[in-house]
Structures are given as C-alpha cells and as structure tokens.
C-alpha cells in the first residue's frame, strides 16, 4: 500500500456537510483496508482564481495509506460529487502525521484574531 496526500476544495455553500463527507471517505478507506493518518480542515479560504464563479472554497487535507483500488474508488467518488470543486492526490514516500505548514499558518491566524479581539475588549 502507498501513502497519499489528498487536498480537496469543497463548495463554500457545502461547508456544513464537510464532516459527513469526511466520514464517508474515511469509511471507504478503512473498508478497503487502508488507514487515515491525518485529517486537516483548513477552513474557508480565498481562491487565487475563480472556479465555477466562486471566489472562496473550503479546503481539506487528508493523508492516507491505501491500495490503488481504494484510490480509484475515492477519486471516482470525488468526480461525481458536485460539492468537490477540485481534488489533488499526491503520492508520498512516508506517512505524514504532524501538522502541515498550511495548518500551522491557519493556527497562527486564529491566534492572532483572538489576540486582536482580546485587545479590543
């Protein structure tokens, strides 16, 4: 089995359905004998260019270990899910379990916002 990193861009109107989508994809992976090493919800972020006339999307990053058959099934599910605007799958040499650079940036932004709110109060 190989290690993969999957980045998903979800339609911003479907943000409340992200946990259910994650559970469905995790179920597909574990049913096929794979494992989920890391799931990061990067939140709603600005897109560099418009996709389907949308300026924002909900970003997800999932690191998994799965067989090729499971990956084909998951990518097939991504293609036929209208909420998934884009997806990118990258093969990794080893499992990534620590927080990614993007997640550290998201955490820094959230900490800065809470500090600003405390100073304003």
Curated annotation (Swiss-Prot):
Signal peptide: none annotated. Residues 99-121 are annotated as: Disordered. Gene3D superfamilies: 3.30.70.60. Residues 105-115 have a biased composition (Basic and acidic residues). SUPFAM superfamilies: Ribosomal protein S6. GO terms for molecular function: small ribosomal subunit rRNA binding; structural constituent of ribosome. One of its GO terms (cellular component) is cytosolic small ribosomal subunit. Transmembrane segments: none annotated. This is Small ribosomal subunit protein bS6. It comes from Polaromonas naphthalenivorans (strain CJ2). The gene is rpsF.
